[in-house]
């Protein structure tokens, strides 16, 4: 059975519009409760590479995060946290002043930092058979990935698959770049990581994306779309097509 990827055309960061589109996207995927059981402990994982002005398209836009948080709360999901293994700074420091902190306060969602890494064995892995994952991640029942559409110096693009690298604890992220130095080996490791953590849903903010010297120093470019899927490879394949890349080259 082929994976389903939902494309949601959207040209601006207006909360009501994004909220409505995300609800439509969830309906196309079978409904929120078919993806995430009621009562589940949920971790929201945006792209929080570093502290930057929202307009620079470095991080997942706060309105996208806020609209999805609103949907979860309105549907009765009680146990929600937000976290990322940020490239620079703490989670709270990166989101402070972006507007994301305001949304989290409104919907009573704590922004947490990872405190401890736990060796996690994944024997099914092809490239990587173990990861050091945060204790706080392993305490959750399910993960929702909220990625940002960007270029990437090593992997050409950073999207749904690459967003999961923020699950690797602390300095082990830097170690991974040494351990898997080529684009191919790093990409295969990322696939193993996604299968190991197994986020239940992937949402991509591509309303304003990043081109050029990504993932942190590129230029904002309007792509006017959000994407949703339960399959990160399928989602990134569509992303690749949108920017005229062959998916097999990524």
Question: Where are the predicted features?
Answer:
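N-terminal and secondary-structure boundary signal
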Residues: 1-250
């Amino acid at each position: 059975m082929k994976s389903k990827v939902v494309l949601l055309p959207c040209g601006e960061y207006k909360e009501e519009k994004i909220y409505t589109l995300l609800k439509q996207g969830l309906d196309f995927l079978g409904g929120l409760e078919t993806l995430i059981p009621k009562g589940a402990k949920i971790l929201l994982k945006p792209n929080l590479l570093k502290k930057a002005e929202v307009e620079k398209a470095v991080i997942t836009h706060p309105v996208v995060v806020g609209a999805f948080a609103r949907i979860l709360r309105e549907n009765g999901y009680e146990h929600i946290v937000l976290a990322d293994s940020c490239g620079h700074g703490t989670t709270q420091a990166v989101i402070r002043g972006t507007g994301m902190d305001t949304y989290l306060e409104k919907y009573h969602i704590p922004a947490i930092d990872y405190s401890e890494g736990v060796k996690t064995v994944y024997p099914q892995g092809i490239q990587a058979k173990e990861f050091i994952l945060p204790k706080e991640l392993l305490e959750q029942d399910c993960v929702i990935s909220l990625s940002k559409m960007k270029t990437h110096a090593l992997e050409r693009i950073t999207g749904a698959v690459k967003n999961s690298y923020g699950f690797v604890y602390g300095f082990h992220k830097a170690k991974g770049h040494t351990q898997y130095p080529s684009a191919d080996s790093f990409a295969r490791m990322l696939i193993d990581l996604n299968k190991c953590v197994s986020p239940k849903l992937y949402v991509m903010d591509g309303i304003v994306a990043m081109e050029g010297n990504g993932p942190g120093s590129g230029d904002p470019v309007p792509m006017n779309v959000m994407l949703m899927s339960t399959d990160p490879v399928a989602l990134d394949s569509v992303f690749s097509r949108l920017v005229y890349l062959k998916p097999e080259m990524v």
